Amino acid sequence: MKLTPIMAAVAAALMALSGCSKQTGVGGTASEATATTQAANAQLAKELKLDDPQDFEDAKRGFMARPTGKIMADDGSVLHDFDAYQFVTGQAPDTVNPSLWRQARLNAEIGLFKVTDGIYQLRGFDIANITLIEGKTGWIVVDALTSRESAAAAMAFARQQLGDKPVTALVFTHSHIDHFGGALGIVSPKDVADRQVPVVASNGFMEEATSENVMVGTAMGRRSSYQFGRDLPRSAKGNVDTGLGKNVVYGTFGILTPTKLITQPTEELVLDGVRFVFHNVPGAEAPAEMTFSIPDKKAYGGAENLAQTMHNLLPVRGAKVRDALRWSSYMDQALDQMDGIEVYFGQHNWPVWGHDRISQFIKTHRDVYKYTHDQTVRLINAGLTPREIADTIKLPKSLSEHFGARGYYGALRHNVKAVYQFYLGAYDGNPANLDPLPPQESAKHYLALIGGSDKAVAAAQTAYDKGDYRWAAELLSHAVFGDPANKAAKELLANTYEQMGYAAEAATWRNSYLTAAAELRNGPPTKGISRAGFIEMLM
């Protein structure tokens, strides 16, 4: 295979990032939850109806079989352990936000599920779901997970339970890698060509898959290891969930070129005897995305436009900022597409059954994004900065009481800043921030003003003891950047990040805080993104 200039640049970057780091950590083990953290988690538990059974009934509905064991890489390493999250049961421990713990328990309901007659889902093989729709001669597969290994394991498990039928169509709902990266574990390029298997995607799919996942894939990969807690232990002091599912399987990534693009706003297509009505929804959760209904089965596939969590308008891993107003408008359109629909299923989390419940589910999400947008815009025009707005806006109880709209993957404060960035960019209007010093230089000046890093650590310890973790983290960030040799600063910053992670409702925030703490203690990863992991996507 001859590498194009883009492929060559990516390969070079991957090689550069695969080198070993020589930095070392300060050692130690993860801290316990402080009294302040325990009190914050206990207060939230009192405010929420954590024992509401509806989601648990839905997450278990249609269960057929559960996988066990591990998904292995070609080199013998473990990519995914189906039993790694068995500790997620019962009441929340002190070190996990109780609302997030509830979500983690729900996402721990993994396996093969029957959604309705002729529609099945595989959950827990990766962060996303595979949906199987029974056609006249085989399986219409919706989405392909993140890696070849996880997709192949899911399909093998499905065939064990449902019979060995061929793949007769593959549908990519959108251009994020956790929905197409395992394509070569679903069907081979030769099979697509020889049997003329339709590969269906939305208009602009290949361009967007390339721009988001290849052009900045190296940086995004490093940041995603924070967002998803890739290297954290699966434990009550580590990775308990991602909000959208249990785990991302970092195996071998690939892609298949679509043979059929959905180019119209609404377009009907018959795949292996099943009538689909596709709806393009570009520029919402992904730059290229589509939802669909299957009228004869009274079913609606919402892709990732809707999930059992507030989504993010700008992921922690980085991406193009998403349009909250457009996203909410697509949900209005979805309500108009619900005629006769009795089951909603997405490509993450669990389904919703019943027409009225589905309508309420969609309305709640629509209103969350519209409220976030409108209130942010109002405060922008009142002259507030991104951080000020993020500290001001709260969801009304009429929205926050719905668990499916709480911030397990997205976070309201982060989304508010995304709306600001969407309209005004990263600059907050303060001229001091037009050309600020780099973090290391700024930190050295702050430390000189304070009287040295030891005094900064002492002040941070006082803040930590009071439970003022945000201020402690700010002080200690200066101490670590300005004096990287100060082990006390790193150790206290690790403790601080752990408390912030233990109290975080968003799994993405928890994973980011705890990954940072782990790297302060143990040093950064000894290797970066594998060049081999991307090779099939570059072909």
Task: Label each residue range with its predicted role.
Residues 29-48, 299, 309, 325-388, ...:
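Divalent-metal (often Zn2+) His-rich catalytic cores of metallo-beta-lactamase-fold enzymes
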